[in-house]
Amino acid sequence: MPIPTVTLRALRADITTLACDAIVNAANSALLGGGGVDGAIHRAAGPELLEACRALHGCRTGQAKITPGFLLPARYIIHTVGPIWRGGRQDEAALLAACYRNSLALAKQHDVRTIAFPCISTGVYGFPPQLAAPIAVRTVREHGADLDDIVFCCFSAADLALYETALNEAR
């Protein structure tokens, strides 16, 4: 079902530079920083983020937790833990959809109107990007009606092409 009032778009950018109400962090279960987008967000947000994440006591796969944005332009950081790809037979698709759904639910609770998502689980967690993009777009279209602007922030040109295709096919 289309969302008439929300803008969904993909762009290639550094998610830590986006001025929106919330950015989503593709975190690990400890929430203590790591590689990829998680490490970039922790470095850009400053040391207060690590302290705030310690107080959250981790996060389970598919769930989401929230902290202030600290030194980022975004007001909030929503941390979600994507599934590790194990061949697709261990509910990876459902867990990935849960990351988007639970991040959006948390955004709604905090009156977030604009949000940016990275490509969750497609880096070191190995989720095939060509499968992840349609799951992300479909889930956000189904559960993002309360927002004004939803951005899929892609690191690579290849990811951007996948998200643009998924967005066009969903229209």
UniProtKB/Swiss-Prot annotation:
Residue span, Macro domain: 1-171
Sorted alphabetically, which CDD domains does this protein's record hold? Macro_OAADPr_deacetylase
Annotated GO MF terms: deacetylase activity
Listed disulfide bonds for this chain?
none
Family label = Belongs to the MacroD-type family.
Q: What is this protein called?
A: Macro domain-containing protein RSc0334
Q: Which organism is it from?
A: Ralstonia nicotianae (strain ATCC BAA-1114 / GMI1000)
